[in-house]
Structures are given as structure tokens and as C-alpha cells.
């Protein structure tokens, strides 16, 4: 059970890393005063926080 949970967490972590990278890339195409820039930044911050929480959980395994 623990191995499966760890495997799932690693898969989620990998997916989050890829998604965050894509969001950062998309954000670079926007001007800083564009409302979408702020939305992308908020999403990046939320997903980065989640990714860090998963990293902490993985350290416990």
C-alpha cells in the first residue's frame, strides 16, 4: 500500500513539475501588466506550493 501511494505521489509530482513549467513558459509571453500574467502567477504559486507539500510527503517515505 505504501509503495503504491509513493508511486502515485511521484507521478503527481512529475505532472505538477511539467504543468508548472508550461505555465511559466506561457506566462513569459505575457506583459506584466496583463491581467492574465497575474492569473498565471497565482496558479504557478498555488501549484508550486502543492508540489512542495508533495516533496515533504515523499521525504517521509
Give the location of each predicted region.
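Short, charge-rich amphipathic interface segments used for partner binding and complex assembly
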Residues: 7, 14-61
Amino acid at each position: 500500500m505504501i509503495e503504491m501511494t509513493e508511486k502515485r505521489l511521484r507521478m503527481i509530482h512529475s505532472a505538477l513539475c511539467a504543468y508548472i513549467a508550461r505555465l511559466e513558459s506561457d506566462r513569459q509571453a505575457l506583459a506584466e501588466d496583463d491581467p492574465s500574467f497575474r492569473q498565471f502567477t497565482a496558479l504557478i504559486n498555488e501549484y508550486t506550493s502543492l508540489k512542495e507539500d508533495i516533496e515533504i510527503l515523499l521525504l517521509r517515505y
